[in-house]
Amino acid sequence: MDEVTVPVTGTPSGQSSELLGHPPDARLLVVNCDDLGMYPAINAAVIESVEEGIASSCSLMVPCPAAPQAMELLSRRPQIPFGIHLTLVREMPDIPWGPLTAKERVASLLDPTGELFPPTPAGRAALLGQARLGEVELEFRAQIDAVADAGLAPTHLDFHCLADGGRDDILDLTVMLAAEYGLAVRVWLEPGRQTMRKRGLPVTDNDFLDSFSLDIEGKAARYAQRLRDLPAGLNEWAVHPSLGDEESQTVDNGWPVRRTDYEFLTSPQAREVLQQEEIVVIDYRTIQQVWSQSMSPR
């Protein structure tokens, strides 16, 4: 694996908003729709949430069955910024997916039955305890290259159900790949964020919001209040919209979370609160520009 030099572009800023050309008191928000490609009702809701709602970017699960449809939708909408939701786990029993790499080449990523681990605490621990970094790299490259082969240009890399990849060496690998491909990385946990800030790279300044952490009852009001309380600096929400239709309810126990996300993201209320609070919604294309300018392979 090639080493990567990540030079500091100057004295690291106290706020990522400054690295992105905004004053330190600006309230910036990335609203990123995760899980694009998992199944068609997610694809439809993500596209609508970006085109008609307040979402600003999305992340594609390349190994999933509806990923080809998602890539076709993205190919017709080059204005939509999207990242690659690097996927090493599978939580949907009724939606089959596995590694893009031949299984015999990534055996350390598989459970005793030859499938991807579930993202349960035990499943994550087993995966992270046995995964060989070289095999993780093979699979990550396969997912990135599949997007490139489709003629698409992603903006960033992030992780499905593994915060910052789950291990320091996996996060380091991902930053190396981002430098090679000219992408940004979503960094969620504070140790990784501190490291990136020291390198002059913009990452979220404040606590990261995963929409699966919110109660469903009263969610719209809770979202609106979070917007009103949004602190200065760069903020990020990882949201998970789906139409919540019959297909969703059949295959996805998390469909109520996804349906309520979709309802808020596309609501007039969401846009009104953003305007009232003078929150600047940005996307990962903006962040990618700073990352790609700041990193160079050695």
Predicted regions and their residues:
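N-terminal pre-catalytic segment of deacetylase/amide-hydrolase enzymes
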Residues: 1-30
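Active-site beta->alpha N-cap acidic-glycine motif
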Residues: 20-93
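Acidic (Asp/Glu)-rich catalytic clusters
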Residues: 21, 46-52, 68-81, 99-104, ...
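Structural preference for beta-strand elements that scaffold enzyme active sites
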Residues: 28-30, 55-59, 79-85, 154-158, ...
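Active-site beta-loop-alpha junctions enriched in small/polar residues
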Residues: 34-36, 63, 85-91, 160-162, ...
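Active-site gating loops and adjacent loop-to-helix segments of metal-dependent hydrolytic enzymes
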Residues: 95-126
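Catalytic domains of cell-wall/extracellular-matrix polysaccharide-remodeling enzymes
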Residues: 130-202, 213-217, 228
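C-terminal domain-boundary segment and adjacent tail
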Residues: 185-186, 251-298
